[in-house]
């Protein structure tokens, strides 16, 4: 990692002999108005503004007329399949015991023998953060309010859901009534 060589937003590094490709990765906001689905605290704020507002107004109907909460097509793809969170590196270190910084090129390039393992760890953690950050947070809120959680992911029919929902089975683990969208 060249991070120690960055001072005042400038890279001060003596390039060793050889052929080099320097890659710079940042976690940037892209203007998407959705909550950070990978961050349970952000999702809790979303739930406070939405679900809790309904509960505050219709608490007597929860568990009777209102038996479930429903979400429709949350997705990581709105960020062109690159949804990330600024807490990712920290959570990666906790889970795997090292920084993910040197693995990021594997998202776009073959980095050698470790390419597949790096992708599995990076995308695997992102899938876990998504399922636990969004689905689990919604499910816990619903359970605490006497209703079920249900809904469905965006594009659950595609063969490779990594950029959309991460891991569909993991998402379903945190839904009381997992759903799919069958149109047509």
Question: Predicted regions: what is each one?
Answer:
Residues 11-12, 55-58, 136-140, 165-169:
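Generic recognition of flexible, low-complexity loop/linker segments
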Residues 74-87, 150-184:
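Substrate-binding cleft/loops of secretory-pathway carbohydrate-active enzymes
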Residues 121-125, 180-181:
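Short, basic, glycine/proline-bearing loop/turn elements
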Residues 6, 15, 66-70, 111, ...:
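Weak global preference for isoleucine
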Residues 67-73, 126-164:
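Aromatic-lined carbohydrate-recognition surfaces of secreted/lumenal glycan-active proteins
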Residues 1-120, 127-129:
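Mature extracytoplasmic enzyme cores
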Residues 59-61, 139-148, 170-175:
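Secondary-structure transition/capping motifs at alpha-helix termini
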């Amino acid at each position: 990692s060249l991070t120690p060589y960055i001072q005042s937003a400038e890279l001060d590094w003596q390039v060793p002999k050889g052929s080099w490709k320097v890659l710079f990765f940042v976690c940037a906001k892209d203007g998407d108005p959705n909550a950070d689905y990978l961050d349970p605290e952000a999702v809790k704020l979303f739930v406070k503004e939405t679900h809790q507002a309904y509960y505050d107004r219709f608490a007597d109907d929860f568990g009777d007329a209102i038996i479930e909460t429903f979400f429709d097509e949350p997705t990581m793809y709105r960020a062109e399949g690159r949804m990330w969170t600024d807490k990712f590196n920290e959570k990666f270190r906790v889970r795997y015991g090292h920084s993910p910084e040197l693995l990021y090129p594997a998202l776009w390039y073959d980095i050698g023998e470790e390419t597949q393992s790096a992708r599995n760890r990076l995308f695997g953690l992102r899938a876990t953060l998504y399922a636990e950050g969004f689905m689990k947070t919604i499910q816990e809120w619903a359970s605490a309010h006497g209703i079920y959680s249900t809904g469905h992911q965006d594009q659950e029919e595609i063969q490779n859901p990594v950029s959309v929902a991460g891991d569909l089975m993991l998402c379903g683990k945190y839904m009381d009534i997992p759903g799919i969208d069958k149109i047509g």
